[in-house]
Curated annotation (Swiss-Prot):
Subcellular location(s) of the protein: Nucleus
Protein name per Swiss-Prot or TrEMBL: Putative homeobox-leucine zipper protein ATHB-51
Keywords recorded for this protein, A-Z: DNA-binding, Homeobox, Nucleus, Transcription, Transcription regulation
CDD domains the UniProt entry points to: homeodomain
Predominant location: nucleus
Region annotation Leucine-zipper: where it falls in the sequence: 134-162
Gene Ontology cellular-component terms listed: nucleus
GO molecular function, one term: sequence-specific DNA binding
DNA-binding region, residue intervals: 74-133
Record-level GO BP terms: bract formation; floral meristem determinacy; leaf morphogenesis; positive regulation of DNA-templated transcription; regulation of timing of transition from vegetative to reproductive phase
Presence of the UniProt keyword Transcription regulation in the record: yes
Length: 235
């Protein structure tokens, strides 16, 4: 279909041309004046639509109505769990945290719930259970860490004390090897020098031996003592 550009432009010009002013110059005539831009022209706004008209299938309309329901359409609401149902599900979860197909069907029949709803509840309950287990594990590890930290601090303090003792002993050994030791008291400080002292017991023994020998030698040289001791006395 061929379109005439010239004819369309002329139609638009004609459509938007202002009409002639009325003969009456009264101001009231303007209120009763009706302007029709499409007067005398076959051009209408509906003629601007080009291309084929796309019709939406009924199936898509139904899906859109289900996804985006309006006030007139009632959506199937999720059934809430009662306290008895929650207690039964909790007991079943405490017995076994994993849900198999047979137990799911059995619970759905007993509680009157959909199997999908039971599966979702078990999935959420397992997630909460795992989070609780992680919290408990964190608390226990935190307590163990605090105990180990305190023990480490105690060992560190003990090592510092032992190092101080070793340092003092090293200083004492150095002073002993140098020959002087300073002993600090409450009132004064005494300096002791290392002096080599001879054993007096050995000197005493040597002196006694020499003295005894002199006594024997003196008795042997004294004739009075020899005579008196060797010959008997006569009356």
């Amino acid at each position: 279909m061929e379109w005439s550009t010239t004819s369309n432009v002329e139609n638009v010009r004609v459509a938007f041309m202002p009409p002639p002013w009325p003969e009456s110059s009264s101001f009231n005539s303007l209120h009763s004046f009706n302007f029709d831009p499409y007067a005398g022209n076959s051009y209408t706004p509906g003629d601007t639509q080009t291309g084929p008209v796309i019709s939406v299938p009924e199936s898509e309309k139904i899906m859109n109505a289900y996804r985006f329901p309006n006030n007139n359409n009632e959506m199937i609401k999720k059934k809430r769990l009662t306290s008895g149902q929650l207690a039964s599900l909790e007991r079943s979860f405490q017995e076994e945290i994993k849900l198999d197909s047979d137990r799911k069907v059995k619970l759905s029949r007993e509680l009157g719930l959909q199997p999908r709803q039971i599966a979702v509840w078990f999935q959420n309950r397992r997630a909460r259970w795992k989070a609780k287990q992680l919290e408990q594990l964190y608390d226990s590890l935190r307590q163990e860490y605090d105990v180990v930290s305190r023990e480490k601090q105690m060992l560190h303090d003990e090592v510092k004390k032992l190092r101080a003792l070793l340092r003092d002993q090293g200083l004492i050994k150095k002073q002993i090897s140098a020959g002087t030791i300073k002993v600090s008291g409450e009132e004064d400080t005494v300096e002791i020098s290392s002096v080599v002292v001879a054993h007096p017991r050995t000197e005493n023994m040597n002196a006694n031996q020499i003295t005894g020998g002199n006594q024997v030698y003196g008795q042997y040289n004294n004739p009075m003592l020899v005579a008196s001791s060797g010959w008997p006395s006569y009356p």
